[in-house]
C-alpha cells in the first residue's frame, strides 16, 4: 500500500484530509465511497475497487475530488458554465446559480449566447434590449 511521505504527506494533510487524524487510506475510502454513487451496480463493490486502486497508487484523482468528496458543501469540479435564458427570471436564476457555485468553491463562466442583440424590441414593455 502506498503511503505519502515527506512533502507529499504534508500537502495531503494540509489540503485534502478532512481532519488531522484522517489517514491516507481513510481518505481513499472517503473519496471512493463518494464517487461510487455515480456507478451502476453495487456501490460497495465500486467503492472497494476505487479504494484498491487509490491505496496502491494506481489511480489518484484530482485535487478538487480529494478535497470535495464527503464534505457537506464540496465541489468535485473546478469550473462550471452556467446557461442563461433571455428573460428576467432567467437572468435571476443565472445569478442565483452563480452565487451558489461560487459559495462552494467553484468557478463560474456564463454563456451569454442566448441573449438577444442590443436594440432588439422587448415584447410587452415597448423597450429595447
Annotated model-derived regions:
Residues 1-129:
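Extended catalytic cores of very large enzyme megasubunits
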Amino acid at each position: 500500500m502506498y503511503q505519502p511521505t515527506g512533502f507529499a504527506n504534508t500537502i495531503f494533510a494540509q489540503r485534502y484530509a478532512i481532519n488531522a487524524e484522517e489517514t491516507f487510506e481513510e481518505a481513499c475510502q472517503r473519496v471512493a465511497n463518494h464517487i461510487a454513487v455515480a456507478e451502476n451496480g453495487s456501490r460497495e463493490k465500486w467503492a472497494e475497487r476505487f479504494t484498491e486502486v487509490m491505496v496502491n497508487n494506481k489511480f489518484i484523482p484530482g485535487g478538487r475530488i480529494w478535497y470535495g468528496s464527503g464534505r457537506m458543501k464540496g465541489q468535485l469540479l473546478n469550473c462550471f458554465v452556467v446557461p442563461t435564458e433571455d428573460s428576467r427570471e432567467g437572468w435571476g436564476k443565472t445569478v442565483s446559480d452563480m452565487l451558489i457555485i461560487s459559495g462552494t468553491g467553484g468557478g463560474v463562466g456564463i454563456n451569454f449566447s442566448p441573449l438577444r442583440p442590443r436594440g432588439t424590441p422587448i415584447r410587452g414593455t415597448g423597450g429595447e434590449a
